[in-house]
């Protein structure tokens, strides 16, 4: 059975480049491959510079899925993503190609790879919890979640208010889960996970340089255009790292240097969470992103995907 190839890792480790290299090599060997995005912010049309989204010309003729599928005013939900991404993967498999899942949004990746089930939503509960978040901050929500679902509280951390609200909403809908099993759920489909790693002392300078490049490449102008398209009303998109800071710069709330430095700090924190999340994938093949033979080592781990 053709497996899903998942290329995961922290921001700045070279996931997109490796996924394209794998797809090109498979194509040269007579096996088609298609890429499925698993970066939550790359779902949004027009959010290109700040998400390091590959332009069409940079995709080397490899079909890509789950890019530019939402307006910035729409809310991204992992449940909707799971459904659409799995549908895309099903189509790829039917065409006899190899699906390559690529991204750093941990829950989005896991929602595809594993047998996750996402409860529905309750607008009244959600609105009440969002009011509480606005009034008290994420710390209080996190403490409540820790009492009711300690596994979720530990996974999310104390700062991600939007995800804490969603987790507490799920608990209120489904009931407390103080003893929920911590074992990874069953795989949805056979998969080979390639996890790119990089020492923190080398990753941080890459991340800082990436943020500087975002501003140099025109992130502020991109955000100005998105604000006219309703970015400020987007529950998910308006909070994206870099975009929120550029919007505050445009509003005169931050200087350019303050906006960049806040983005750097948040990007470093996000990368730490990514490393922690993907570190829990026990069956992943760990690959050093600095390796001169990275592609060869990645392909060595994919015998079932090759002709």
Curated annotation (Swiss-Prot):
Name of one Pfam family that matches: IPPT
Cofactor(s), names only, from the UniProt record: Mg(2+)
GO terms assigned for molecular function: ATP binding; tRNA dimethylallyltransferase activity
The enzyme's E.C. designation: 2.5.1.75
Entry binding sites for substrate: 11-16
Site (Interaction with substrate tRNA): 105, 126
Residue numbers binding ATP: 9-16
Enzyme class (EC, first level): transferase
This protein's UniProt keywords: ATP-binding, Magnesium, Nucleotide-binding, Transferase, tRNA processing
Keyword Iron-sulfur recorded: no
Reactions accelerated catalytically: adenosine(37) in tRNA + dimethylallyl diphosphate = N(6)-dimethylallyladenosine(37) in tRNA + diphosphate
Segments traversing the membrane: none
Biological processes annotated in GO: tRNA modification
Family statement: Belongs to the IPP transferase family.
Subunit structure: Monomer.
Functional note: Catalyzes the transfer of a dimethylallyl group onto the adenine at position 37 in tRNAs that read codons beginning with uridine, leading to the formation of N6-(dimethylallyl)adenosine (i(6)A).
This protein's name: tRNA dimethylallyltransferase
Species annotation: Clavibacter sepedonicus (Clavibacter michiganensis subsp. sepedonicus)
Name of the gene: miaA
């Amino acid at each position: 059975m053709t497996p899903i190839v998942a290329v995961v890792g922290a921001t700045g480790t070279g996931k997109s480049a490796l996924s394209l290299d794998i797809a090109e090599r498979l194509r040269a060997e007579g096996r088609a491959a298609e890429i499925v995005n698993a970066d939550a912010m790359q779902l949004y049309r027009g959010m290109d510079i700040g998400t390091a989204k590959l332009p069409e010309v940079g995709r080397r003729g490899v079909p890509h899925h789950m890019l530019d599928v939402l307006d910035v005013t729409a809310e991204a939900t992992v449940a909707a993503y799971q459904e659409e991404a799995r549908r895309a993967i099903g189509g790829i498999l039917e065409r006899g190609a190899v699906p390559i899942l690529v991204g750093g949004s941990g829950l989005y990746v896991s929602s595809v790879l594993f047998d996750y089930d996402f409860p529905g939503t309750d607008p009244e509960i959600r609105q009440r919890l969002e009011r509480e978040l606005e009034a008290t901050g994420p710390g209080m929500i996190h403490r409540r979640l820790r009492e009711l679902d300690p596994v979720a509280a530990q996974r999310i951390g104390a700062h991600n208010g939007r995800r804490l609200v969603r987790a507490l909403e799920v608990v209120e809908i489904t009931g407390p889960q103080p003893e929920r099993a911590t074992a990874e759920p069953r795989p949805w489909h056979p998969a080979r996970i390639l996890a790119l790693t990089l020492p923190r002392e080398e990753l941080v300078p890459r991340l800082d340089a990436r943020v500087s490049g975002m501003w140099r490449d025109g992130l502020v102008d991109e955000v100005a255009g998105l604000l006219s398209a309703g970015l400020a009303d987007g529950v998910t998109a308006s909070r994206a790292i870099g975009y929120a800071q550029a919007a505050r710069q445009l509003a005169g709330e931050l200087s350019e240097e303050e906006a960049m430095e806040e983005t750097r700090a948040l990007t470093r924190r996000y990368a730490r969470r990514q490393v922690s999340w993907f570190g829990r994938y026990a069956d992943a093949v760990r690959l050093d992103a600095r390796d001169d033979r990275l592609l060869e080592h990645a392909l060595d781990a994919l015998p079932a995907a090759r002709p």
